[in-house]
Amino acid sequence: MIKLKVKKGDEVVVITGKHKGKKGKILKVFPEDSKVIVFGVNLVKKHTKSNQMSEGGIITKELPIHISNIAHIDPKTGNPTKVAFKFLEDGSKVRVAKKSGEIIGKEGK
């Protein structure tokens, strides 16, 4: 298992595949599979049976996307960027956009 540079709540864009160019927020991360679920991307319709807990019908849900197919959105420019780790003066480790040097995520606040 590799260390992922993505976290729940990050803004990302799809860079390859049939959903190329779509932007969204990460809803869930699967580190063991190196996949993420992005809101509004890779939607499928699933037919469900009714049971005691819920009605049957057709529901729309997101399927996971491999992390190699997404890129972070630079908070300063809004363009796709790579991510690096950097240590601040107080010793805390933060994720930084390589293009602009802007801190990504809540760690900088």
UniProtKB/Swiss-Prot annotation:
Q: PROSITE patterns given for it? A: RIBOSOMAL_L24
Q: Which keywords fit this entry according to its UniProt record?
A: Ribonucleoprotein, Ribosomal protein, RNA-binding, rRNA-binding
Q: Which GO terms describe its molecular function?
A: rRNA binding; structural constituent of ribosome
An annotated GO cellular component of this protein is: ribonucleoprotein complex
Leader sequence range is: none
- Any S-S bridges, and between which cysteines? none
Q: How does it assemble?
A: Part of the 50S ribosomal subunit.
Query: Could you tell me what this protein is called?
Result: Large ribosomal subunit protein uL24
Chain's gene name: rplX
